[in-house]
């Protein structure tokens, strides 16, 4: 869980920026995106195959 503690003279804007950066680095939004709907084993294999093809292309 990501937590941001406000400093004594810190504004809300900078704290929000720090929070967004921490969430992005932790990969929380990507995890939520993948768990939004159930992914069948077939869909998982297809997604991984497409990712492997993309990775191989570069």
UniProtKB/Swiss-Prot annotation:
GO terms for molecular function: structural constituent of ribosome. GO terms for biological process: translation. Keywords: Ribonucleoprotein, Ribosomal protein. GO terms for cellular component: ribonucleoprotein complex; ribosome. The keyword Ribonucleoprotein applies. Belongs to the bacterial ribosomal protein bS21 family. This is Small ribosomal subunit protein bS21B. It comes from Trichormus variabilis (strain ATCC 29413 / PCC 7937) (Anabaena variabilis).
